[in-house]
């Protein structure tokens, strides 16, 4: 069990770049299909109306988030690393590291879709039982920590940086990814 957990924690660094890209694409498409099926993303930002959007829009949003996550990290990797690294390796490893975020939809699959939808629309979450909110907050925070850790492991493998310098550069790249993703999603919503 200890070996399994150890392998799972360092998986973004030990998996081959091609496998990381293929698994990442599988989870990206699977997450887009699940998100489309559950229709948990608001179709209107203003009044939180819920409904179905086209499947392709979920795939486009997923790809936009993936690209906006990988571009700043690619820039930092190119600046730090002395030898060249393939663009598809950076995109593949960062897409693989994004897999834990897909698990946010699991409670909708196995639980109450209405409570899950209300939790995701934060202005409506005050109507939920406190135990459900605490469980979901813990669950979401654990997945985000897992995502950031896997991203750091993949980043450290690509840049060959460990310690505080690696953490600081990864933090800067993630902040750049956040800003870029906010811009990209904002542009997609306006289209």
What does each model-identified segment do?
Residues 13-18, 79-89, 156-165:
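Membrane-interface helix-boundary motifs at transmembrane edges
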Residues 92-157:
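Alpha-helical transmembrane segments of helical membrane proteins, especially in multi-pass transport
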Residues 48-115:
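Alpha-helical transmembrane segments with an aromatic anchor "belt"
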Residues 41-55, 117-128, 188-191:
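Membrane-interface interhelical loops and short amphipathic "cap" helices
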Residues 1-52:
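N-terminal juxtamembrane cytosolic/stromal segments of multi-pass membrane proteins
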Residues 24-32, 58-71, 94, 98, ...:
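Alpha-helical transmembrane spans of integral membrane proteins, capturing the lipid-embedded, hydrophobic core
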Residues 151-175:
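Interfacial loop-to-transmembrane junctions
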Residues 178-191:
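Juxtamembrane boundary at the C-terminal end of a transmembrane helix
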């Amino acid at each position: 069990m200890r070996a399994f957990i150890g392998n799972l924690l360092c998986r973004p660094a030990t998996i081959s770049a091609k496998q990381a890209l293929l698994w990442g694409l599988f989870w990206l498409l699977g997450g887009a299909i699940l998100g489309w099926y559950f229709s948990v993303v608001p179709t209107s930002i203003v009044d939180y109306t819920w409904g179905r959007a086209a499947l392709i829009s979920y795939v486009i949003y997923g790809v936009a988030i993936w690209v906006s996550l990988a571009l700043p990290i690619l820039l930092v990797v190119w600046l730090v690393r002395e030898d060249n690294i393939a663009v598809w390796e950076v995109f593949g490893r960062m897409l693989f590291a994004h897999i834990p975020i897909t698990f946010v939809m699991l409670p909708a699959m196995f639980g109450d879709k209405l409570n899950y939808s209300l939790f995701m629309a934060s202005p409506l979450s005050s109507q939920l039982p406190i135990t459900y909110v605490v469980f979901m907050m813990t669950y979401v925070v654990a997945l985000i920590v897992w995502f950031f850790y896997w991203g750091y492991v993949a980043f450290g493998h690509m840049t060959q940086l460990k310690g505080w310098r690696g953490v600081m550069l990864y933090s800067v790249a993630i902040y750049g990814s956040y800003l870029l993703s906010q811009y990209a999603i904002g542009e997609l919503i306006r289209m």
